[in-house]
């Protein structure tokens, strides 16, 4: 069977094979979504080019990486923080005004994050040259004290973590860490959904970004090396 469909306003064709059922009829299974959205964190800017999340965007139902040709990035108004508990990761909840809050475009969905460009006027207004910092090579990253940077309550704050282990042979679980900051634990329970992409700084250098929460202990999580996001 030849199936014609629209993607990004363009007509495309795919060959599919229906399955014959025990009722002597044919059925075709399709998984169709027009778009996908979620809350995450921008990790870094270089000019007006950005990277975010630290991992790919995947479909919640199938777990498969989304094959995307583009999208938009929006400012999000956080309205509620559902704290994480053991075996129950929390999440950031927010609202997006799609016509008002568009600040850039997403050009790619990669294994170690999403990337694209922010509006130049938005960058000039919200980011200052004085905030720039060096990035660290993986061999500079050490176990011990580091900080997660986040705007969970609207203001930029840094939260102390302890890097427990370093792995150079994995894609985006390069660091294991434990949240030590009592304010962050009180606010989120540790790590929650929506914090993916939150930058991690050690010794004044950007070393990586939060990627995953440990379900059995939400005060622990994983992070990706910043170098792997840049690649």
Q: Where is each model-derived feature located?
A:
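PDZ-domain C-terminal substructure recognizer with occasional recognition of PDZ-binding tails
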Residues: 1-28
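Short, solvent-exposed secondary-structure boundary/capping segments
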Residues: 25-30, 171-177
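Catalytic nucleophile loop of clan PA
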Residues: 188-209
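PDZ domains, with a preference for the canonical peptide-binding region formed by the helix
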Residues: 1-10, 217-219, 224-228
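Charged, low-complexity helical/coil segments in non-catalytic cytosolic or luminal regions
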Residues: 43, 48-174, 212-218
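Short coil-to-beta-strand transition motifs
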Residues: 10-11, 32-38, 153-160
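Short conserved beta-strand and strand-loop elements enriched in small hydrophobics
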Residues: 2-6, 144-152, 200
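A structural micro-motif recognizing beta-strand termini
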Residues: 30-34, 55, 151-152, 178-183, ...
């Amino acid at each position: 069977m030849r199936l014609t469909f629209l993607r990004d306003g363009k007509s495309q064709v795919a060959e599919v094979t229906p399955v014959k059922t025990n009722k002597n009829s044919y059925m075709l299974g399709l998984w169709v979504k027009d778009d996908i959205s979620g809350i995450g964190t921008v990790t870094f800017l270089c000019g007006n080019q950005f990277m975010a999340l630290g991992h790919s965007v995947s479909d919640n139902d199938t777990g498969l990486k989304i094959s995307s040709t583009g999208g938009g990035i929006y400012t999000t108004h956080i309205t509620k923080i559902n704290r994480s508990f053991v075996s129950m990761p929390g999440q950031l909840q927010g609202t997006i005004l799609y016509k008002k809050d568009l600040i850039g475009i997403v050009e790619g969905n990669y294994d170690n994050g999403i990337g694209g460009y922010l509006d130049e006027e938005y960058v000039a207004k919200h980011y200052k040259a004085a905030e720039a910092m060096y990035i660290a090579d993986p061999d500079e990253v050490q176990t011990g004290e580091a900080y997660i940077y986040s705007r969970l309550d609207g203001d930029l704050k840094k939260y102390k973590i302890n890097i427990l282990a370093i792995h150079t042979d994995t894609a985006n679980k390069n660091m294991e860490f434990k949240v030590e900051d009592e304010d962050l634990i009180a606010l989120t329970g540790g790590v929650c959904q929506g914090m993916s992409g939150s930058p991690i700084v050690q010794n004044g250098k950007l070393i990586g970004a939060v990627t995953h929460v440990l379900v059995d202990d939400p005060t622990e999580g994983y992070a990706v090396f910043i170098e792997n996001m840049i690649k």
